[in-house]
Amino acid sequence: MDTKPPRQRLIGLTGGIATGKSTVTDYLQQKYSVPILDADLYARQAVEPGSEILVAIARRYGPEILDQQGQLKRQALGEIVFNNAEEKQWLESQIHPFVGRCFRSALAQLKQEQTVLLSIPLLFEAQLTDWVTEIWVVTCGPQQQVERLIKRNGLTEAEALARITSQMPLAEKVALADVVLDNSGQIADLEPQIIKAWHHR
């Protein structure tokens, strides 16, 4: 008789920028109380005032990359890295190891949880697919991505497009997904897809 404990379900949630990943995580947390580990949250912690990584960023780009309170000017940094692949790679080389340590620490504390969701926008780009047991990709139309970035982040169309094209093409992520969530419609259209994916083990 097989007495091995059931394998922990680790859902890797990813997708293009501004496709609606946070909508999915919010819904799962509210409906199923699933623990959420968020790479974006860890990345923000990595550059908090006084951190070694923020010091390195200021050393590379100058003190004008910080505001008067010593906080990172995210918009200014974005203008640099989303238009320069080499600088983007350098920044990720600083932040990704910190994010990885945060994930490992959090997962070690959640071993008793049946399911954990890891929200990782750069799941494929950072080669973290081995961390998860299944991959969910959130998708929508490219024009919707642009419009959401303009509205949410206050970007110009050119800036929005630069951020989208700096990432792995969404179609390639979809091809590698176990589950595809189409968020090109309303939340009422998305919810049944999330429920179906949740119950499909």
From Swiss-Prot:
GO molecular-function terms, A-Z: ATP binding; dephospho-CoA kinase activity
The reaction(s) this protein catalyses: 3'-dephospho-CoA + ATP = ADP + CoA + H(+)
Keyword Nucleotide-binding (UniProt): yes
EC number: 2.7.1.24
Gene3D superfamilies, per database record: P-loop containing nucleotide triphosphate hydrolases
Keywords assigned by UniProt, alphabetized: ATP-binding, Coenzyme A biosynthesis, Cytoplasm, Kinase, Nucleotide-binding, Transferase
GO biological process, one term: coenzyme A biosynthetic process
Family annotation (Pfam families): CoaE (PF01121)
Pathways involved: Cofactor biosynthesis; coenzyme A biosynthesis; CoA from (R)-pantothenate: step 5/5
Subcellular location: Cytoplasm
Name assigned to this protein: Dephospho-CoA kinase
Species: Synechocystis sp. (strain ATCC 27184 / PCC 6803 / Kazusa)
Highest classification ranks of the organism: Bacteria, Bacillati, Cyanobacteriota, Cyanophyceae, Synechococcales
